[in-house]
Amino acid sequence: MAEEIIVALFPCTFAEGGECTVPAGSRVVLGLGWAAKNRGLVQNFLQAQTTTISIDDAAPVDISDSYSAIGPFPDGGFATRIRHDTGVTLSAGESLQVDGMLAVSHVVPDGVIDETTNRQAFFRPEQPLSIHCRITATA
């Protein structure tokens, strides 16, 4: 059985320019999560969110019900996560394109302060998060 490699979709999309690499022979597991300063804010997110993904331009799949139970961080805060096994094992040079959308039905605060405005940050229905990550296997 191929070794699982978890690809964190938010870092791939927002910090790594939408591209990441995994070792050849890896089975790709997608990771996604939401964190906030208290359990109630995470529960609010879970009740408001719709999360979909598409792999290699296939029809989008609704994974909204795949979030884990809410759990605490050791240093404070709470999170819920998705671990989505694609079932795909990549050989050297092969790639997988993941596209998705995370939207909410109402304004969701996450309890953090925006470093630019020094105000609380909010996730809004009119500003869904687009997920785009090309995962390529290297030798």
Residue positions per predicted region:
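Aromatic-rich surface patch/π-platform used for binding flat ligands and interfaces
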Residues: 92-94
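Beta-strand-rich recognition domains
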Residues: 1-55, 59-88, 97-139
